[in-house]
Amino acid sequence: MLTEQLDWEKTDGMMPAIVQHAVSGEVLMLGYMNKEALEKTEATGKVTFYSRTKQRLWTKGETSGNVLNVVSITPDCDNDTLLVLVNPIGPTCHKGTTSCFGETGHQWLFLYQLEQLLAERKHADPESSYTAKLYASGTKRIAQKVGEEGVETALAATVNDRFELKNEASDLMYHLLVLLQDQGLDLGEVIDNLKSRH
């Protein structure tokens, strides 16, 4: 168990826990865990801290619903600090921002947020949005759209139309993300696959 390998004496029983977005790498917040908070975090898969002001365990998002789903917990080389990789549901900060350190503007984070939105639309009323209608039309139609947008992207590049290339590449990425969601895959899996090749 992770609690046993940590140096609790060095931290006076309160382990600093740096919370980082598992996809974008953005630092979201810093909290403190005692042994009980860490054990609850491991047991539930939701980040739980020890609140020094409330003097009790506090699961992030327990009232707002903006929970932090744990991907991994790794101690540093001295076993006196934790790095907690998470997939957040909603904003992390009580001020409504992605990070407690303000909006850092990480561009890759937008793709993750778009992917979350597309996942929500998968089960929405087809009349509510283009995306929901696209899901309702089925895999063949979604795949056809990816093919069409791929060809249009290539054609824009061959005529050196940077404006149109940007627009068509955006359409291609959008439709590709819809197709991945339709097939139960996410962008993280594609990124992992790319990493394994290089």
UniProtKB/Swiss-Prot annotation:
Residues 1-110 are annotated as: Phosphoribosyl-AMP cyclohydrolase. The keyword Metal-binding does not apply. It is found in: Cytoplasm. GO terms for molecular function: ATP binding; phosphoribosyl-AMP cyclohydrolase activity; phosphoribosyl-ATP diphosphatase activity. Residues 111-198 are annotated as: Phosphoribosyl-ATP pyrophosphohydrolase. Its EC number is 3.5.4.19, 3.6.1.31. One of its GO terms (biological process) is L-histidine biosynthetic process. It catalyses: 1-(5-phospho-beta-D-ribosyl)-ATP + H2O = 1-(5-phospho-beta-D-ribosyl)-5'-AMP + diphosphate + H(+); 1-(5-phospho-beta-D-ribosyl)-5'-AMP + H2O = 1-(5-phospho-beta-D-ribosyl)-5-[(5-phospho-beta-D-ribosylamino)methylideneamino]imidazole-4-carboxamide. Its main location: cytoplasm. InterPro entries: His_synth_HisIE, HisE, PRib-ATP_PPHydrolase-like, PRib_AMP_CycHydrolase_dom, PRib_AMP_CycHydrolase_sf. This is Histidine biosynthesis bifunctional protein HisIE. It comes from Klebsiella pneumoniae. The gene is hisI.
